[in-house]
């Protein structure tokens, strides 16, 4: 008879008992699995969950999209599948929390990136050394919205440091091709050129450590202004253990670097939420609009990043970082919940605005809100201000 090794599923993916059904659906989609292992707090087997258990008619579009992405054998087909993801995401904006919608978008976008890497890799003969495709910024945090560009890089490990430049020149044409494929799939080139096809962000493990060490030894807070998105990196394709190794090194070196953390906090505190003493909101003088990203969600993202680096938290998502920080610092549960709900509400408004395409992305007129939304946004900004007050280093 056939050996069990020929029919078994390797690389078992597990989730804790505390994981939501939504997280389980996303894990099934991302890894193209039929079953997930559920473990308890000690890591012991607690049960199994299957696609049949989790998928309803309301969520079948996930399976359809996953199948379309996996079936794409050329750029045109992949671009069409990516377009379908964005259309489905726009429909989901009113159905779930912003955290779930953004995570749903990011996971499916991960599959698009994986397919883009596979398509590009078939065109090149890559070096036989470990390498990993990294996502930075919102994709690294699992917080991509409907309006997003690409921020990515490569980390590789040469057999000898002398081979670094030669290997980089081997990886760059491949990386640029992936960037081109992603652009064709609706992920525009990064305006700041934070892409793997840029030699600055196609680095060896040693070079990445040197890059982070340089940022962590900056002379002024200004030197860090354009570096923050790199501290949200996450593995997408290739040898994912390289990203884990780099993150372990980063957390080991960032937590006790008080000057670096103070500089990060100083930058995070440069702009506060747009709350007025007389009026409810301080809007832009010319447009009369609020910038929900710059003056809202950014505050939560920046604070969560700093707390994660200070406390050694490996989670890259803002909500996960705040949850972990709250547990480690003993924040009352109601404070953590209020903070998470405030961030989610601002993200929900951003998603709604991007779906409606009624004006500039991430900007909103207070007059467009109903009375309840107006009050909720005001309280969300207050929660942002409270969170900023916790950044004392």
What label would you give each PLM region?
Residues 14-33, 39-40:
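The conserved cystathionine-beta-synthase
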């Amino acid at each position: 008879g056939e050996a069990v090794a020929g029919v078994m599923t390797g690389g078992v993916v597990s989730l804790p008992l505390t994981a939501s059904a939504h997280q389980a659906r996303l894990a099934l989609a991302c890894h193209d699995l039929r079953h997930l292992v559920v473990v308890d707090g000690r890591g012991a087997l607690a049960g199994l969950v299957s696609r049949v258990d989790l998928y309803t008619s309301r969520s079948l579009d996930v399976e359809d999209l996953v199948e379309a992405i996996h079936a794409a054998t050329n750029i045109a087909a992949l671009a069409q599948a990516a377009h379908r993801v964005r259309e489905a995401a726009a429909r989901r904006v009113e159905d779930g929390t912003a955290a779930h919608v953004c995570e749903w978008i990011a996971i499916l976008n991960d599959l698009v990136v994986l397919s883009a890497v596979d398509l590009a890799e078939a065109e090149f003969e890559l070096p036989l050394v470990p390498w990993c495709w990294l996502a930075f910024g919102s994709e690294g945090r699992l917080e991509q919205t409907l309006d997003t560009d690409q921020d990515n890089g490569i980390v590789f490990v040469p057999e000898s440091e002398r081979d670094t430049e030669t290997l980089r020149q081997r990886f760059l044409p491949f990386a640029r091709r992936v960037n081109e494929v992603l652009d064709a799939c609706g992920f525009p080139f990064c305006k700041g050129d934070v892409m793997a096809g840029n030699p600055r962000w196609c680095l060896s493990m040693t070079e990445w450590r040197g890059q982070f060490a340089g940022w962590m030894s900056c002379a002024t807070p200004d030197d860090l202004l354009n570096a923050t998105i790199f501290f949200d990196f996450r593995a997408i394709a290739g040898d994912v253990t390289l990203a884990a190794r780099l993150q372990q090194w980063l957390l080991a070196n960032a937590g006790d670097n008080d000057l670096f953390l103070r500089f990060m906090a100083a930058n995070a505190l440069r702009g506060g939420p747009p709350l007025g003493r007389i009026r409810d909101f301080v809007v832009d003088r010319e447009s009369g609009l609020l910038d929900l990203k710059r003056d809202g969600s950014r505050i939560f993202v920046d604070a969560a990043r700093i707390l994660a680096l200070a406390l050694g938290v490996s989670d890259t998502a803002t909500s996960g970082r705040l949850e972990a920080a709250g547990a480690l610092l003993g924040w009352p549960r109601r404070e953590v919940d209020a903070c998470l709900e405030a961030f989610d509400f601002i993200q929900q408004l951003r998603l709604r605005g991007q779906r409606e395409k009624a004006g500039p992305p991430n900007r909103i007129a207070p007059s467009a809100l109903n009375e309840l939304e107006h009050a909720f946004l005001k309280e969300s900004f207050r929660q942002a201000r409270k969170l900023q007050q916790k950044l004392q280093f």
